[in-house]
Amino acid sequence: IISGGENISSIEIENAIAKHPSVSLAAVVAKPDEKWGETPCAFVELIKDKPATEKEIIDFCRETLAGFKLPKSVIFCDLPKTSTGKIQKFELRKKVKELS
């Protein structure tokens, strides 16, 4: 992800989000942005009966990530996976483009 000329590792953001007590899985992809070029967009699968809000997730990330690395949006959903359990990021990229 390249946001405002800064390279951002999606894995670093995913690892930060995954430490939240309500998060089961997280995946981060680039979301097109007019001002910054791209911004991090997080897709989060929550643990059953452990709710969380977009603000909670972003505030949680703020404790360990630099401001420019914070996800600008968080979408809660079941993450698409292959038969071996790998997250299908290409499907998430398609979903982000539909939402933009």
Q: What residue spans do the PLM features occupy?
A:
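AMP-binding/adenylate-forming catalytic core of the ANL superfamily
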Residues: I1-K69, C77-P80, G85-K94
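Acidic/polar alpha-helix N-cap and adjacent early helical turns
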Residues: V96-S100
